[in-house]
A protein has these predicted regions:
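Conserved P-loop NTPase motor "coupling/switch" region that bridges the ATPase
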Residues: 122-124, 151, 167-168, 194, ...
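Conserved pre-motif I regulatory segment
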Residues: 61-98
Length: 535
């Protein structure tokens, strides 16, 4: 049933053509008004009413577009894509948010929950997300977007998580694997009725984690699954995700065997391949859904530059402090040159990356799981090919092993790589290699790699020329999509380097300024930086 409707922003009401079955669906007497010989029902324009109208075959406009203040504390105005995403989320108690990386999924669903919360349609929120995103993505985004809401990150031992869960808050945030430690206690919290599953595709296999989530998710009023790449391997990847959000809906088969037969066919004893139209059919099971690419965000420029904060491990923090202290002690004469500053800066950047050159053995590997996990999550989210830049050979070797361990199809290019042209042609012109892992100095001139749309800087390079030329590999004639440049950072030295690269200044200048500040704090008095006397 489709008819003209009138929405009043002032009264928060919607007028819809009257239908007798509305009395049963609404469950209370309905006020009516006659206009131009047509009888209209006067209803509150709320998410609950919208869902009730849909049950009657009436698609009403999403209330969030009419009755929500989108303002955030940092003054960011939502993209139209984010508003459209919030419309879907607030209009359906189960929904798939399949937007690409960089389109603002996190804010979209936070705005959605806050609107429902303000309307009295949702209580508290539980976010289940990758460990590396708990603090620097979700908790920070809550602060930036809605500082009036209190968020608590449930991390640590079971006792620590339970103590954190006992704290009063509006939003609780926990990692996927941490959920099992306090799942019973979370299940008992009836005041938490909205669930966001970030990186939904982690549940694509029949694992204990997936089975537990299938049971756990059913008790929530609102459940939204977020992933930019729901089928990282095969169309059948969607089955267990759908069993969590929409079991028994959209023609989803009852078991995985039936789903596999519907989407794939067997060509020999060990190999199955997708049927024609398998991906489209898999998407019909993932409904209701919204899916936007970075190209759909018209408010963004063609090249989007973003930084991603990651916490250093305790081992990295200790080594970072040691090396910074050693450098300050080394310049006893209080003369800091560009040469010794460059050495110190390089060592600190290596610590942040987790691989440090030393005399014996050749390098030391530090605990950097958070950065590695973040990299893997970014790769899993990307819908197109990617380039990962790492500025040291030992770091490249470590990341290549990480990719191999996680079955990521990749190629490696560094100064000693043979058959470089063959690798680049395969990456650019064939489906081979999902990720190109490279030293930026080996790709900074003449190479066209427009098959990729995303570049991830695992650690910064200190040469502005190499940085710009390396980025230009995907910003060339033939590129048909917007490009995303992601910078991983964990320390002030990395932030300074990236900042200087973006504004085209010498990175050593930024580091010298940092050292000047550190020495003033540590030693006091006067000293020289590049020959300049500073009080």
């Amino acid at each position: 049933m489709t008819s003209s409707m009138v929405v009043s922003k002032a009264t928060g009401q919607i007028l819809v053509p009257y239908d007798p079955k509305l009395d049963v669906l609404i469950g209370e007497p309905i006020k009516t008004i006659r206009h131009k010989n047509q009888l209209f029902a006067i209803l509150p324009h709320t998410p609950r009413t919208q869902i009730q109208l849909r049950a009657a075959g009436i698609e009403a406009p999403a209330p969030i577009l009419w009755h929500y203040d989108w303002a955030s504390s940092d003054g960011v105005v939502p993209f139209q894509v984010q508003k459209n995403t919030a419309c879907l989320a607030t209009s359906h108690q189960r929904a798939y948010i399949l937007n690409d990386m960089g389109t603002g999924k996190t804010r979209s669903v936070l705005w959605s929950w806050r609107f429902l919360h303000n309307q009295g349609a949702a209580k508290k929120l539980l976010v289940v997300a990758p460990l590396s995103t708990l603090k620097f993505t979700w908790a920070h985004e809550v602060i930036r977007t809605m500082p009036e809401m209190k968020a608590v990150v449930l991390h640590g031992t079971k006792a620590q998580r339970l103590a954190l869960l006992a704290r009063p808050a509006d939003i609780y945030i926990i990692n996927h694997d941490g959920l099992k430690t306090i799942v019973k206690e979370l299940h008992a919290r009836k005041d938490i009725d909205c669930l966001i599953l970030d990186e939904l595709a982690v549940y694509r296999n029949r694992s204990q984690r997936s089975l537990q989530m299938q049971a756990f998710a059913q008790r929530f009023v609102w459940v939204w699954g977020l992933t930019g790449r729901p089928m990282p391997n095969e169309p059948t990847d969607v089955f267990h995700q759908c069993k969590i959000l929409t079991p028994g809906s959209n023609g989803l088969p009852k078991n995985f065997t039936h789903a596999k037969t519907a989407l794939m066919y067997q060509v020999d004893q060990y190999r199955w391949v997708p049927r024609d139209g398998a991906i489209d059919r898999a998407y019909t099971w993932m409904q209701p859904a919204v899916r936007y690419s970075l190209d759909d965000v018209v408010e963004l420029p063609e090249a989007v530059y973003r930084t991603i904060d990651i916490e250093l491990s305790e081992q990295q923090k200790t080594k970072y402090r040691e090396m910074a202290s050693e450098f300050i002690t080394m310049v006893q004469d209080k003369v800091i040159t560009a040469a010794n500053a460059a050495v110190a800066m390089g060592k600190l950047l290596q610590v942040c990356a987790g691989y440090v050159y030393v005399k014996n053995p050749q390098h030391v590997v530090l605990d950097s799981d958070s950065r590695k996990d973040t990299l893997l999550e970014l790769i899993s989210e990307a819908s197109e090919k990617l380039i990962v830049f790492a500025p040291w050979r030992h770091l490249i070797d470590g990341l290549s092993q990480l990719f191999t361990d996680n079955a990521i199809d990749h190629a490696v290019i560094h100064g000693e790589t043979s058959h470089r042209e063959k690798i680049l042609n395969a990456f650019q012109s064939t489906s081979q290699y999902r990720v190109l892992l490279a030293h930026p100095g080996c790709l900074h001139h003449g190479v066209t790699l427009t098959a990729a749309t995303t570049i991830i800087w695992y650690s910064p390079i200190c040469s502005l020329e190499i940085y710009e030329q390396a980025n230009a590999r995907i910003r060339r004639v033939g590129q048909r999509h917007k490009q995303l440049f992601l910078h991983l950072q964990s320390s002030e030295v990395e932030r300074k380097v990236y900042r200087m690269l973006r504004v085209k200044q010498r990175t050593q200048d930024a580091f010298l300024e940092m050292i000047k500040t550190s020495m003033a704090t540590t030693n006091g008095g006067t000293y020289d930086v590049e020959g300049t006397t500073t009080p």
